[in-house]
Amino acid sequence: MNFICPKCKGALTVTDGGTAKCPLGHSYDRAKEGYYNLLLSSVGGTHGDNREMVMARRAFLDTGAYMPLARRVAELAAEHTPDGGLLLDCGCGEGFYTHTINEIAKNANKTLHIHGFDISKAAVRLAAKRDRDLSLAVASSYDLPIAD
């Protein structure tokens, strides 16, 4: 995991219990689905798409209508990212493309460190359920919690 603390920008390390902590003591629990909520916001409420919107998008994408596009994007991503390289999916939504990239890379015997970010907690939750191999976080693409 290459995540950094959204408060102090220190490196996050994961404890045996799954909590991500920075050197200054800020901590972030891993959700049961396997993602972290690293969104700092003074505004309460829902950010990004709500559960109903995300579920509707997943239902449509799972029909396969966009699978040829997803496969081609995944092939290009795997082809142009070096083995062991880092790939960021900013605005990963419910994980359709992120998961496809991961699967195409695995089928090509290529290891990619894939991080997905979305401002929608509902979307990231579904992405984490779709693919437990991904490193996912609720975060804003305007302030990505990732090390340079």
Predicted stretch roles:
Residues 1-47:
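N-terminal auxiliary segments of SAM/dcSAM-dependent transferases
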Residues 16-17, 78-85, 106-109:
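Short, glycine- and charge-enriched coil/turn segments that flank and shape catalytic ligand pockets
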Residues 51-72:
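Class I SAM-dependent methyltransferase Rossmann-like catalytic core
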Residues 69, 73-77, 97, 101:
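Generic hydrophobic alpha-helical segments
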Residues 74-82, 144-145:
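Glycine-rich helix-loop-beta junction characteristic of Rossmann-like nucleotide cofactor-binding loops
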Residues 86-88, 94-143:
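Class I SAM-dependent methyltransferase SAM/SAH-binding core
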